[in-house]
Curated annotation (Swiss-Prot):
UniProt GO molecular function: ATP binding; ATP hydrolysis activity; ATPase-coupled phosphate ion transmembrane transporter activity
Name recorded for this polypeptide: Phosphate import ATP-binding protein PstB
Protein task: Part of the ABC transporter complex PstSACB involved in phosphate import. Responsible for energy coupling to the transport system.
Locations listed in the record: Cell inner membrane
Entries under PANTHER family matching the protein: ABC TRANSPORTER I FAMILY MEMBER 17 (PTHR43423:SF1)
Gene3D superfamilies in alphabetical order: P-loop containing nucleotide triphosphate hydrolases
NCBIfam families, sorted: 3a0107s01c2
Organism whose genome encodes this protein: Nitrosospira multiformis (strain ATCC 25196 / NCIMB 11849 / C 71)
Pfam family, one: ABC_tran
Family under the similarity heading: Belongs to the ABC transporter superfamily. Phosphate importer (TC 3.A.1.7) family.
Length: 269
């Protein structure tokens, strides 16, 4: 029987207020393949943390541990903990409902993936799953989410049109609004601008800068310039391990690890 977050007992010591999440000795297996190796890292409250590294290094695998996406496929397994504060809950525990995890930790994928529904229903979907039925509440939450994604002024007069009618950049902002509608505590971005043009990319980056005042953000990007622009903290990953983690300016200007420096400067990648 799964338990609600509110039923969980505190795990470990109380976290300092600046941390939203702690990753403790996290390893992850795709079947018998070890994809992540003993990762330890903090996510700072209401800051942007970027994951960088070459293709296949484990960035997206790590990101998807946070909202239990790997649970959808048999044979995958976690070892270690991801602690969500202030509850001190290990969200990888089998006693924690993954649906509840995904309500608290939302995700925006690489390519815009609107549902085959209206703009309004795309944003309202998660709210309806949570049991919200009153139209006035739905209307308010949908508007708030669309405003939060800087999309309201562009769609307020066509909320009941199909989301597929929006441009690529608008569709991605709609997906962000859908993620915001349930008031998540952490927002995950997996290469959110890789399928967008430079103008739409700049719009999403500005939005991320605005959102960090409200929510903790973890972003995977292959674009190191983007990581430098949008993030407060950066983790460099290689072969399933976090090689170096720290303040973004330090990682990009004066990294401590030579392997990090080689990747940042283009000598390795």
């Amino acid at each position: 029987m799964v338990k609600d977050f509110s039923s969980q007992h505190p795990l470990g010591d109380v976290s300092p207020s600046q941390y939203k999440s702690e990753v403790r000795n996290l390893s992850f297996y795709y079947g018998s393949f070890l994809a992540l190796k003993n990762i330890n890292m903090m996510l700072h409250e209401k800051k942007v943390t970027a994951l960088i590294g070459p293709s296949g290094c484990g960035k997206s695998t790590f990101l998807r541990c946070f909202n239990r996406m790997h649970d959808l496929y048999p044979g995958n397994r976690y070892m270690g903990d991801i602690i969500l504060h202030p509850d001190n809950v290990n969200i990888l525990s089998r006693s924690v409902d993954p649906i509840e995890v995904r309500m608290r930790i939302s995700m925006v994928f690489q390519k815009p993936n609107p549902f085959p529904k209206s703009i309004y229903e795309n944003v309202a979907y998660g709210l309806r799953v949570r049991g919200v039925r009153r139209r006035a509440i739905l209307d308010e939450k949908v508007e708030d989410a669309l405003r939060g994604a800087a999309l309201w002024d562009e769609v307020k007069d066509r909320l009941h049109q199909l989301a597929y009618n929006l441009s690529g950049g608008q569709q991605q902002r709609l997906c962000i609004a859908r993620a915001l509608a349930t008031d998540p505590e952490i927002l995950l971005f997996d290469e959110p601008t890789s399928a967008l043009d430079p103008i739409a990319t700049a719009s999403i980056e500005e939005l991320i800068a605005d959102l960090k005042d409200k929510v903790t953000i973890l972003i995977v990007t292959h674009n190191m310039q983007q990581a430098a622009r949008v993030s407060d903290y950066t983790a460099y990953m290689y072969l399933g391990e976090v090689i170096e983690f720290g303040v973004t300016d330090t990682i990009f200007i004066k990294p401590k690890n030579k392997q990090t420096e080689d990747y940042i400067t283009g000598r390795f990648g």
